[in-house]
Structure formats: C-alpha cells, structure tokens
C-alpha cells in the first residue's frame, strides 16, 4: 500500500482492492499469506474490563519505510510475523509481570497457522475444541481452545467473553494462564498454557483413589487457588475433577505422586461487582458437586465453592462421590441432608483429622462451613497444631464449636483440671499462726454478702463473686499465686461489678464460695 494512504481516513489497495482505516494496520492479502490484522486489544490484570489500544501510527510508518526498502522476495517472510512481533516481543510471556494479555482481532484463522503448528486434539465440546499447538519460533507448546461463535449462540458467547475477561484478570500459580486471544468474526482462539498430564479425573480413574498425603497436596493447591479467587470477589461455581488440570507430576521417595494442578474452565465463573454483592441466585454447576443451597434455589455465596472442594477431596480419597443415587431428584435429596459415611475399608487408613476437614467443608449450612482461607490454615494441611488462628469474635467461636465440638470439650476439660487461684488460696497455709483480728464466721459472711447484694445488686452472682474475690489481700501470698492474680486480666463483668464501693469493712474479707 502507498504511504500516502496513512494520512487519509481510508484508502484502497491497488492489488487487492481492500480498504484500510486510519490507525489500523493492514497487510495486503494478495502479496502475503497473512490476512489483514484489524485491532490489537490490551488487557490489564488490575481490571476485569479490557483496555483497547491500536498499534501506533508512528510504528506503522516505520514498518512501511522498512517495507519500501526491502526487496520483493523478502516481503512475505517479514509481514507474516506482524502478529508474532506484536504479541511476543512486546506483550509475550516474558513480559507477563506487566499484566498484559493481548487480544488480537484478525480476518480469519490463517494468521494463527502462520504462528503455530497444530498437533493432537486434547478435548472436544459442543461448540469448541482444544488442540495442542507449538509456537514455530520459540517451540513452546500451548493449548489452543477454538470456539465457534456461530454455533455457540449469543448466550454462550457472553459466557465465553466473561471467561476471557476473568482469565485476563487473574494470575496465580494454580490457575490456568491465558497467554493471548485471537478473534475472528466467526471464531475465538484462546492460547493457554498446556497441561500435558491431562485432567485430574483421568488420573483418578487410573489410580482408583489417592493416598491421604497425595490428596493433601492437591487440596492445598486447590484451596490456595480458590482463596485467591474469593479474595478477588470471583466465584468459580463449577469446581470438579474435570476442571482441574495437571501440569506436571513428581514421584517422591515414598512412591507417592505429587501433582502440580491448575484450575481451569471459568465458563460459569462470576465476578461480584462489589463486596456488598455477596449473594448469587443462578442455579448452575454439575449435580454431584453442587452445594445444598444451590440446588435448593436459595441465595448463595462463594461458599458453594467450598462444598465442591469437599466433594473433590472425598472423591480423591474414596474414588467415588459422597452421594450417589439413581435419579437427580434422589441425588439432590441426599445432598440436602449432607450425611457423610466412612464405612468403606478405604477410610480405615484415613486420619480423623482428614475426616474432620471433610465434615467442615461439607456443612449443609454454608454459614458453618470453613472458608478457603481457614482451610489453608487448618492443621491437616499445615501439619502444625498451633497454626490454626483462634476465633476472634462470637460468630467465629460459635462456628468453631459447631465444627469441632470435641476440641472445645478437650479445652474445657483441661481448664477444669487446672487448679484455680481460689483452690490454691484454699490449700495455702501461711507460715505460723497469724490470727485475724477481724475474723468472722462463714454464716456471718454469708449474711453480710446477702445484705450487700440487696443494697447494691450486681448484674449476676458471678460478677459479685468476682468483685468480692478481687478485694483479697495479696500481701501474705506466695510469689506464684500473687503473680498469677496480677496477670489475670480484668473482664468487662469485673469492671461492672467494681463500680460499687464497699461500705462494710467485713465485705473486704468475703470469700468466693467453692
């Protein structure tokens, strides 16, 4: 094309009669094997929406100058790499830290064949196909998902666009990486990292089931990915074994397999527009993985993903789903009940801690399920019993009590067995016989305490007892007991009780009855 055409709104090529628009790079299809490139869009990971940018006019002029001084025989080889230079040199994998994913619009799919060599088919869908492809220049292998937009229809195309936007916005070691996107009027090509070991479900089918250690590694990676998504207000909504790909695997010294997994298929994923938009309504997902609140058509939150993690974990350990039925209606009934069973012999080798995690993941009430962040901190994953963060508010304490009543009972038993300060005081005998000049009998003290309570009622008997015991002198106490009393924090109830000054000298000697 003539250089003067760059300064006009549009012009026609004398060889192919194709029109080019201002600020849009076009390559003559009659002179090269590459269809015209229309628009290059750039997307930032800091935003779900994609920011579009056109190739600058200065760069086009520079390319035209280079093209003019180049011989005719060299023209095809240079122009055939226009997309490659734009995507790989400026926005390639090496520059991924800048958070840019190129979205290149082209006339047809021939341009992609100039960049990639297509290989085996990795998977098929109702209106799409996934093919292994090798970059001709770098020899890097990728998985290209090709979707026929015409067959998919408008609703499916919207889901595809949402999936693309979400993949452009995320970056996590256990979430599939989107390298770039090519789009024609009829098709869309997603170039993603290749997971050569295939789906996690295929590996499970071959093994039968995983050991507890093997499952722990997988769940830790999965929980990390889901915690990242939830922290960014993204709900996957279709977690299942088929949507967990295996990038690579490693056999350790114990002959156990360690899998590097990637969460994929964000077709049903949704990003909440704000923190206040906590609940979702649409019923979606795969039945055996669906949470009770989803199948009941109730409002639900990101906790539906937690239930799905529980189903995945159960299947990894057992080799089959936690709920099986002859019909979908009966299946949903079992899911609503949420009763887990561990009668099979395979569970004999599984620790109680792992079973406890399953129960916490698959609580019927989503409010009582642990979160992805709490799962990451669970001692079953960390191996550290002290790693779990203690609850900081009443709701969290109530949830912990519901999830781990045994541990709460153990803590309560320990506290009961631990001698209290009052018991130490009772057993303590001071050196020698030190007479108390103001000594009064127990009956007299009881009468005085009752009279005081009537005159100055406290909020509870416990508060009154705390108030009374707080007046006990520590002058004659041994250092151990004295230090313990000084370290004891003053609770709000104690503060309330001490508002009322003692009007009787005998009150200062009142003891808490044991």
Swiss-Prot record:
GO annotations of cellular component type: manchette; nucleus; perinuclear region of cytoplasm
Subunit record text: Homodimer.
Any GO MF annotation of the entry: protein serine kinase activity
The protein's name: Serine/threonine-protein kinase 33
Keyword annotations: ATP-binding, Cytoplasm, Cytoskeleton, Differentiation, Kinase, Nucleotide-binding, Phosphoprotein, Serine/threonine-protein kinase, Spermatogenesis, Transferase
UniProt keyword Nucleotide-binding, yes or no: yes
Polar residues bias: start-end ranges: 449-468
Gene Ontology terms: biological process: manchette assembly; mitotic DNA damage checkpoint signaling; protein autophosphorylation; spermatogenesis
Superkingdom, taxonomy of origin: Eukaryota
Enzyme class name: transferase
Enzyme Commission (EC) number: 2.7.11.1
Residue spans of biased composition, Basic and acidic residues class: 65-86, 413-426
Organism whose genome encodes this protein: Homo sapiens (Human)
InterPro entries: Kinase-like_dom_sf (IPR011009), Prot_kinase_dom (IPR000719), Protein_kinase_ATP_BS (IPR017441), Ser/Thr_kinase_AS (IPR008271)
Tissue: Highly expressed in testis, fetal lung and heart, followed by pituitary gland, kidney, interventricular septum, pancreas, heart, trachea, thyroid gland and uterus. Weak hybridization signals were observed in the following tissues: amygdala, aorta, esophagus, colon ascending, colon transverse, skeletal muscle, spleen, peripheral blood leukocyte, lymph node, bone marrow, placenta, prostate, liver, salivary gland, mammary gland, some tumor cell lines, fetal brain, fetal liver, fetal spleen and fetal thymus. No signal at all was detectable in RNA from tissues of the nervous system.
Record comment: activity regulation: Specifically inhibited by CDD-2807 ((3-([1,1'-Biphenyl]-2-ylethynyl)-1H-indazol-5-yl)(2,6-diazaspiro[3.5]nonan-2-yl)methanone).
Subcellular location: Cytoplasm; Cytoplasm, Cytoskeleton; Cytoplasm, Perinuclear region
Binding site for ATP: 122-130, 145
Protein kinase domain segment(s): 116-381
């Amino acid at each position: 094309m003539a250089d003067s055409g760059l300064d006009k709104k549009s012009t026609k090529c004398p060889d192919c009669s194709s029109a080019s628009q201002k600020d849009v790079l076009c390559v003559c299809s009659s002179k090269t094997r590459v269809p015209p490139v229309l628009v290059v869009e750039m997307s930032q990971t800091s935003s779900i929406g994609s920011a579009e940018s056109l190739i600058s006019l200065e760069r086009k002029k520079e390319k035209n100058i280079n093209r003019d001084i180049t011989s005719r025989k060299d023209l095809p080889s240079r122009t055939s790499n226009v997309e490659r230079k734009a995507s790989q040199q400026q926005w390639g994998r090496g520059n991924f830290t800048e958070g840019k994913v190129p979205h290149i619009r082209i006339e047809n799919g021939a341009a992609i064949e100039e960049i990639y060599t297509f290989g085996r088919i990795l998977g098929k869908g109702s209106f799409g196909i996934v093919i292994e492809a090798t970059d001709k220049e770098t020899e890097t292998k990728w998985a290209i998902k090709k979707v026929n937009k015409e067959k998919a229809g408008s609703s499916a195309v919207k889901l595809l666009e949402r999936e693309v936007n979400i993949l452009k916005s995320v970056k996590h070691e256990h979430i599939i990486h989107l390298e770039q996107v090519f789009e024609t009027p009829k098709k869309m090509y997603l170039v993603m990292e290749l997971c050569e070991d295939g789906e996690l479900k295929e590996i499970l089918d071959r093994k039968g089931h995983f050991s507890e250690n093997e499952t722990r590694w997988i769940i830790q990676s999965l929980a990390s990915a889901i915690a990242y998504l939830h922290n960014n207000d993204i709900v996957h909504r279709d977690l299942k074994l088929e949507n967990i790909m295996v990038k690579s695997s490693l056999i350790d010294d114990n002959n156990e397999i360690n899998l590097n997994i990637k969460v994929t298929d964000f077709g049903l994923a949704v990003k909440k527009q704000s923190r206040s938009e906590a609940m979702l309504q649409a019923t979606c997902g795969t039945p055996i993985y669906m949470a009770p609140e989803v199948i009941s058509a109730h409002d639900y939150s990101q906790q539906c993903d937690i239930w799905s993690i529980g189903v995945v974990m159960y299947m990894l350990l057992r080799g089959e789903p936690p709920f099986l039925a002859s019909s979908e209606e009966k299946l949903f009934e079992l899911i609503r009940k949420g009763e887990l069973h561990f009668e099979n012999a395979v569970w004999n080798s599984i620790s109680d801690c792992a079973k406890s995690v399953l129960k916490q993941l698959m609580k019927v009430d989503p409010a009582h399920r642990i979160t992805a962040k709490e799962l990451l901190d669970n001692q079953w994953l960390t191996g550290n019993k002290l790693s779990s963060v203690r609850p900081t508010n009443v709701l969290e304490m109530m949830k912990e009590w519901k999830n781990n009543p045994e541990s709460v009972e153990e803590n309560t038993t320990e506290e009961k067995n631990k001698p209290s300060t009052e018991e130490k005081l009772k057993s303590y005998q001071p050196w020698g016989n030190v007479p108390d000049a103001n000594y009064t009998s127990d009956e007299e003290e009881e009468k005085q305490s009752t009279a005081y309570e009537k005159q100055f009622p406290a909020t509870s008997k416990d508060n009154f007892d705390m108030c009374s015991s707080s007046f006990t002198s520590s002058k004659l106490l041994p250092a151990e007991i004295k230090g313990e009393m000084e370290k004891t924090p003053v609770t709000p109830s104690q503060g309330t009780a001490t508002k009322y000054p003692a009007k009787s000298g005998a009150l200062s000697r009142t003891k808490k009855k044991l």
